[in-house]
Each structure stands twice: as structure tokens, then as C-alpha cells.
Amino acid sequence: MSQPTVSASPHLPRAYLDPIDNASDALAVVHLAMQTPMVPELIGFLLDPHNRGGSIVVVGDVPEHDHDAVCRMVELLSQAAPSPDDEGAYGLVVASIRPDGWLVDGDADRWRLADGLSRLNGVDLLEWFVVGRHGATCPRLLAGDPERW
């Protein structure tokens, strides 16, 4: 079964200046941080209440079949986010780089768990991308959740 894909924007948002307002811009940031050639890794970044990003966290040497690692990353990054203030909550974008894979069984449940973990810390999980050799897709779609941009 083919999965819907997301394409990266040719526009690369500047750190701390340009808002990341859509999945294409967020995926462009993910592509910037990815290793070449592609290896199993996790990538994540927080967005301020104005959707501007800064630092990118890359976790390499992720065991290829440790699909739950993304939930641990979401939990840690959302705990590290500043508390929501008058300007609103922080957002979070994560990506699982699966060079030889795609969506796997349980990704919809992982999306729901990761979303709950981020909300416990006052952070909005905006997107989780799964990136493979054939493109990128979002487990959110499997869960039937709407886009959050």
C-alpha cells in the first residue's frame, strides 16, 4: 500500500528568525540535519510560540528496530522546553530516519503516546516525520489526526 508523502520546501527557515509554519519547511530543516548517506537516527527541534526554531537535536546510532526511541525523544525534548507563557505553548517536530524502512506496525499508537507525552509538558507535538529512501510520511495520518500547522 502506498503511503502519502510530504515534500521538503526549497526555502530553509533561518534559526531564531523565520517561522516554520508548515510541514514542508519543517521537513527542509530535517533534511538539513540528516546524515548523508542516510543512517538510522532521530532528529528533533523545538519551536517557540511564534514557530521559530533554534537548536536541532540529532541522535545517531539508533538501533534500526528501536521504533519506540522516538517517544523517549519527545518526552525528553518536551521536558526541556520552557513553560508555556502568555505568548502560548512551544511546538515540537521530530523525525525518525529509517533508511530501509517506512511506517511500521504500531506507529499510529506511537504517535498517540508521543502526543500525550508532549502535552503533559505543555508542548504541542506538531509533526513526526518518518523519512526513508522513498520520501517522508507522517504517522499522524495513520492515527487519523488532522494537520497541526
PLM regions: where:
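Polybasic/polar functional segments that serve as interface/processing modules
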Residues: 1-149
